[in-house]
């Protein structure tokens, strides 16, 4: 058996004093629980274990894979344009004024204009004028308990609703459709024809016949442009 090493009292005192010095050094400094001990923070002496542990931890952290940072996705949101409330008479000639109720492109049809202030009808058809007047009354009495636009129109024509009911078997013909909008002080009524086999949509759109029996022109759309 190997003989156990023996230490003199002087050697034991040196080891104890070195250990106490290391403890006093760290107790006299603020301790951050999330940080590791660097090699430079370890005082000289019998501290080989602490030094090796600090170096091993530093090497492990350096060798760890670096996670790539996620790029922030920027959504391409179109900018909004706020309309100017200035006098429209001061705008340059032919300045287009956007209105969500009036599409830029329309199918062939007719426009009826009714001035709310004077009651003057610029152009249009009999049906368009009746609808424009009903639209004017609805605009002026929309906060009252009077009859609604639907009641006024349907009382004169039961088939006022676009795509009114067709009795019996389907026959190829046209269906008159209308679109009402308020622009400034005017009521604009736009009308056009669609084949009865076409669907009824919320947009001003011209459909083609799918049943093969609807005519290309009818008595109502002969004057459309």
From Swiss-Prot:
Record-level GO BP terms: symbiont-mediated suppression of host cytoplasmic pattern recognition receptor signaling pathway via inhibition of MDA-5 activity; symbiont-mediated suppression of host JAK-STAT cascade via inhibition of STAT1 activity; symbiont-mediated suppression of host type I interferon-mediated signaling pathway
One GO cellular component, as annotated: host cell cytoplasm
Pfam families, per the entry: Soyouz_module, zf-Paramyx-P
Chain residues that bind Zn(2+) 2: 197, 209, 211, 214
Metal-binding in keyword set: yes
Basic and acidic residues bias spans: 158-169
Its biological purpose: Plays an essential role in the inhibition of host immune response. Prevents the establishment of cellular antiviral state by blocking interferon-alpha/beta (IFN-alpha/beta) production and signaling pathway. Interacts with host IFIH1/MDA5 and DHX58/LGP2 to inhibit the transduction pathway involved in the activation of IFN-beta promoter, thus protecting the virus against cell antiviral state. Efficiently blocks type I and type II IFN signaling following infection, probably by targeting host STAT1 for proteasomal degradation.
Protein name per the record: Non-structural protein V
């Amino acid at each position: 058996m190997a003989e156990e090493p023996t230490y003199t009292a002087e050697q034991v005192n040196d080891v104890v004093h070195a250990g106490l010095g290391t403890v006093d050094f760290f107790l006299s400094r603020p301790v951050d629980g999330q940080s590791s001990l660097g090699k430079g923070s370890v005082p000289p002496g019998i501290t080989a274990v602490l030094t090796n542990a600090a170096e091993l931890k530093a090497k492990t952290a350096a060798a760890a894979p670096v996670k790539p940072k996620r790029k922030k996705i920027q959504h391409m949101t179109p900018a909004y344009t706020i309309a100017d409330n200035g006098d429209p008479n001061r705008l340059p000639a032919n300045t287009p004024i956007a209105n969500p109720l009036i599409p830029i492109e329309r199918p062939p049809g007719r426009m009826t204009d009714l001035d709310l202030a004077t009651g003057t009808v610029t152009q249009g058809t009999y049906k368009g004028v009746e609808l424009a007047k009903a639209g004017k009354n609805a605009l002026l009495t929309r906060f009252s308990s009077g009859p609604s636009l639907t009641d006024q129109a349907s009382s004169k024509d039961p088939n006022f609703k676009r795509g009114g009911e067709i009795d019996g078997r389907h026959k190829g013909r046209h269906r008159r459709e209308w679109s009402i909008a308020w622009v400034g002080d005017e009521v604009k009524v736009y009308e056009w024809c669609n084949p009865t086999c076409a669907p009824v949509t919320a947009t001003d759109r011209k459909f083609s016949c799918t049943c093969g029996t609807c005519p290309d022109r009818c008595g109502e759309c002969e004057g459309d442009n």
